[in-house]
């Protein structure tokens, strides 16, 4: 009986993941060599680009993604958002190159995610648990997003 219930549940889950209205093949252009219009309202290609791989910036084909998430930034004690750097390639270099190759690309900063140090985890906890500190963090996130010409934020807590 349990196996039958599990099978029924799994079948329903799989069927619910597919709706006839969102068929990606609706975006096929028979005259296009790539066949699928990546910039339709239906198809999304999201790439995560970790800061420690910024040295590969010149090898990335940004024209093949619709959304780029820069991973991972975190706040320091005063709420300032910091993206670590490991080489000479900056966030501005990545954003500028991505936008020069793909004017439709949406670029987001991914916050938290990955393996947080205990210090960074404590900073997040402090801001999230304290209703008076939370607005400071939000202001710093908005400031970082605007200063770096980003389109939004991906929170990966």
PLM regions with names:
Residues 27-145:
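Glycan-recognition patch characteristic of GH18 chitinases/ENGases
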Residues 6-9:
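Sec-dependent N-terminal signal peptides
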Residues 19:
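Short, conserved catalytic or interaction motifs in soluble domains
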Residues 140-157:
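Active-site groove signature of glycoside hydrolases
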């Amino acid at each position: 009986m349990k196996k039958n219930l599990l099978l029924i549940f799994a079948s329903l889950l799989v069927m619910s993941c597919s709706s006839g209205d969102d068929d990606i093949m609706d975006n096929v252009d028979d005259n296009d060599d790539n066949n699928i219009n990546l910039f339709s309202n239906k198809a999304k290609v999201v790439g995560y680009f970790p800061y420690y791989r910024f040295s590969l910036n010149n090898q990335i084909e940004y024209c093949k993604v619709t959304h780029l998430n820069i991973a991972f930034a975190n706040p320091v004690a005063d709420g300032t958002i910091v993206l670590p750097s490991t080489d000479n390639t900056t966030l501005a270099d990545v954003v500028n190159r991505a936008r020069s190759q793909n004017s439709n690309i949406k670029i987001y900063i991914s916050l938290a995610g990955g393996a947080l140090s205990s210090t960074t985890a404590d900073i997040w906890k402090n801001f999230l648990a304290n209703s008076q500190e939370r607005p400071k963090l939000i202001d710093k996130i908005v400031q970082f997003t605007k200063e770096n010409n980003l389109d939004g934020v991906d929170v990966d807590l």
